[in-house]
């Protein structure tokens, strides 16, 4: 049994259930906070085969991936690949994944709203934040459309 490789249909990496049929980069990209490019960089740094399916990973490879994904900064990847550079409180370059990423994003929006910045005000009123037009798009409710005359 030692030489036999078993296929797992669902693999848990970084607290996320990943479909075993996916190739490694696409499987890792299904984790929130990790895109295809970051996944490929991590795979190359660990010396894994990008064509390998997630279900064929050994327990040791899963453990190594899990360990590295908890702190991607230890791999020495370029800073532009991180998703949180120059953190507001610490000033450090971080790479967040999963619920931690959601928590930090929500906290940033709350801070913007509290200080009363333009972005914060737009968020507070539920309007578009990034300069999109609002005259015709982004209307909430009012979905009657055209009514036939009786």
UniProtKB/Swiss-Prot annotation:
This is Small ribosomal subunit protein uS13. Located at the top of the head of the 30S subunit, it contacts several helices of the 16S rRNA. In the 70S ribosome it contacts the 23S rRNA (bridge B1a) and protein L5 of the 50S subunit (bridge B1b), connecting the 2 subunits; these bridges are implicated in subunit movement. The gene is rps13p. Pfam families: Ribosomal_S13 (PF00416). The keyword Heme does not apply. InterPro entries: Rbsml_uS13_C (IPR027437), Ribosomal_uS13 (IPR001892), Ribosomal_uS13-like_H2TH (IPR010979), Ribosomal_uS13_archaeal (IPR019977), Ribosomal_uS13_CS (IPR018269). GO terms for cellular component: cytosol; small ribosomal subunit. Gene3D superfamilies: 1.10.8.50, 30s ribosomal protein s13, domain 2. One of its GO terms (biological process) is translation. One of its GO terms (molecular function) is structural constituent of ribosome. Belongs to the universal ribosomal protein uS13 family. Part of the 30S ribosomal subunit. Forms a loose heterodimer with protein S19. Forms two bridges to the 50S subunit in the 70S ribosome. It comes from the Archaea. Keywords: Ribonucleoprotein, Ribosomal protein, RNA-binding, rRNA-binding. PROSITE patterns: RIBOSOMAL_S13_1, RIBOSOMAL_S13_2.
């Amino acid at each position: 049994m030692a030489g036999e490789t078993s296929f797992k249909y669902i693999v848990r990496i970084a607290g996320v259930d990943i479909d075993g049929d996916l190739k490694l980069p696409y499987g890792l990209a299904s984790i929130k906070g990790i895109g295809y490019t970051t996944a490929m960089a991590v795979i190359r740094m660990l010396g894994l085969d990008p064509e390998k399916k997630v279900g064929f990973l050994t327990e040791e490879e899963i453990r190594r991936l899990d360990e590295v994904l908890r702190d991607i900064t230890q791999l020495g990847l370029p800073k532009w690949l991180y998703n949180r550079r120059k953190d507001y409180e610490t000033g450090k370059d971080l790479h967040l994944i999963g619920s931690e990423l959601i928590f930090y994003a929500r906290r940033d929006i709350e801070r913007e709203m509290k200080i009363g910045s333009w972005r914060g005000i737009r968020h507070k009123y539920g309007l578009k934040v990034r300069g999109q037009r609002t005259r015709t798009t982004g209307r909430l409710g009012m979905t009657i459309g055209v009514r036939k005359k009786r």
